[in-house]
C-alpha cells in the first residue's frame, strides 16, 4: 500500500543525518515516492554575507557563497546515492529560521511526511533540541524523528492510542491515522506491532486518602474496575478494524499516559512509537499536549508524531 508520495528529509549537519537519509531512502523506495533533501542555513538571504563581511573586513559575499556551496555539495552527495538507488530526488538549501523554512517547504510542496534525525550528541545518539521540538509541534504533516544511530530498521513498533467514546469522531479518526501509519511501518519492516492505551481513574489517590472517602476502598475499587472495563471496551472496538494486531500485542497500561507509555517503551525495547498529538483544532497555533510532550522528552527511541485533522500551523508562507 502506498502511504506516501512525497518524502521530505531534513539533513542538518548537526543531526543524525545519515540515519535520516537511510530511512527516508528506504521509505521512498517502498512507496515509489519522490524524495526531497533539504538543509537550512540559519540566516536570511543577505544576512550571512553581511555577518561575514563584518568578521573578515571584506569578501563577505564570496565567503557566504562558499558556505552555501558547501551545503549544496553535501546534499548533492546524498542525492547521488538516492539516484543510484533509483529514487526520484531533488535537493534544496534553504535560508532562514530552520524550522520555519522546513514547514514553509511542506506548505509549498505538500510533502506527506518529514523525516529528521535528532540533534547529534557526543555518544552518537540523538537528543531533541529546539529545531526538533519546533517541527514536532508545528509541522502540519507527520514528523518522524530518529534518535538512535541504528534506526535504519525496526523490530518492535508501538502505536500509542487514546480510544474515543462513540460520539468523538475526531479522536477516532486520529487514532486510525496512528494505527494505519504504524501498521504500514510494521508491515514494511516485518516488525512486531503493539498497541497501547493508558487509562486511570481521575483523582484515585485523592479518593483513597480523602477525608470523606478513605473508608470506602471497596467502592473505589469498583470505580477503578469500571474505568478499566470502559478503557478495554474502547480499545477492543478500535482494534476490531485491525485484525493484524494479535490480542497479546494490545496493552492496557494503568497510570499517567505520558509516563506509563514511555516506561513501557523502554522496558519492552520498542524501536518506534507512533502517536497522535492533541491540538486546538481550527486555531492557528498548536499545543502538543502533556502526554506527547512527556513521551518525547522521556523516550530513547524514535517517534512519529501525527497531527489531528483540522490542525493549522502558526507558520505562514509569508512572514509567519
Q: For each of these PLM feature ranges, what is it?
A:
Residues 1-58, 156-217, 313:
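Small/aliphatic-rich secondary-structure junction motif
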Residues 133, 180-183, 236, 293:
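Active-site phosphate/pyrophosphate- and oxyanion-stabilizing loops and adjacent acidic/basic residues
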Residues 1-3, 16, 23, 45, ...:
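Structural beta-alpha unit
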Residues 20, 71-74, 174, 178, ...:
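Hydrophobic alpha-helical membrane-association signature
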Amino acid at each position: 500500500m502506498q502511504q506516501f508520495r512525497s518524502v521530505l528529509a531534513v539533513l542538518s549537519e548537526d543531526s543524525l543525518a545519515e540515519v535520516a537519509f537511510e530511512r527516508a531512502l528506504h521509505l521512498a523506495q517502498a512507496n515509489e515516492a519522490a524524495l526531497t533533501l533539504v538543509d537550512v542555513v540559519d540566516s536570511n538571504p543577505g544576512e550571512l554575507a553581511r555577518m561575514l563581511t563584518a568578521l573578515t573586513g571584506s569578501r563577505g559575499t564570496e565567503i557566504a557563497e562558499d558556505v552555501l556551496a558547501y551545503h549544496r555539495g553535501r546534499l548533492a552527495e546524498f542525492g547521488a546515492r538516492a539516484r543510484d538507488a533509483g529514487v526520484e530526488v531533488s535537493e534544496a538549501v534553504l535560508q532562514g529560521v530552520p524550522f520555519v523554512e522546513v514547514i514553509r517547504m511542506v506548505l509549498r510542496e505538500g510533502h506527506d511526511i518529514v523525516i529528521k534525525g535528532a540533534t547529534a550528541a557526543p555518544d552518537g545518539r540523538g537528543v531533541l533540541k529546539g529545531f526538533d521540538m519546533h517541527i514536532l509541534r508545528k509541522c502540519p504533516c507527520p514528523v518522524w524523528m530518529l534518535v538512535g544511530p541504528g534506526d535504519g530498521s525496526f523490530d518492535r513498533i508501538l502505536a500509542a492510542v487514546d480510544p474515543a467514546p462513540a460520539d468523538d469522531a475526531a479522536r477516532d479518526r486520529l487514532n486510525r491515522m496512528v494505527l494505519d501509519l504504524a501498521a504500514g511501518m510494521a508491515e514494511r519492516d516485518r516488525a512486531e506491532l503493539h498497541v497501547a492505551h493508558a487509562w486511570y481513574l481521575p483523582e484515585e489517590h485523592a479518593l483513597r486518602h480523602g477525608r470523606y472517602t478513605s473508608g470506602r476502598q471497596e467502592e473505589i475499587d469498583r470505580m477503578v474496575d469500571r474505568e478499566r472495563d470502559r478503557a478495554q471496551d474502547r480499545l477492543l472496538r478500535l482494534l476490531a478494524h485491525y485484525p493484524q494486531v494479535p490480542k497479546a500485542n494490545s496493552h492496557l497500561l494503568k497510570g499517567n499516559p505520558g509516563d506509563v507509555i514511555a516506561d513501557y517503551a523502554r522496558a519492552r525495547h520498542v524501536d518506534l512509537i507512533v502517536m497522535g498529538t492533541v491540538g486546538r483544532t481550527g486555531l492557528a497555533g498548536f499545543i502538543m499536549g502533556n502526554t506527547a510532550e512527556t513521551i518525547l522528552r522521556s523516550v530513547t527511541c524514535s517517534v512519529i508524531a501525527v497531527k489531528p485533522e483540522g490542525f493549522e500551523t502558526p507558520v505562514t508562507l509569508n512572514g509567519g
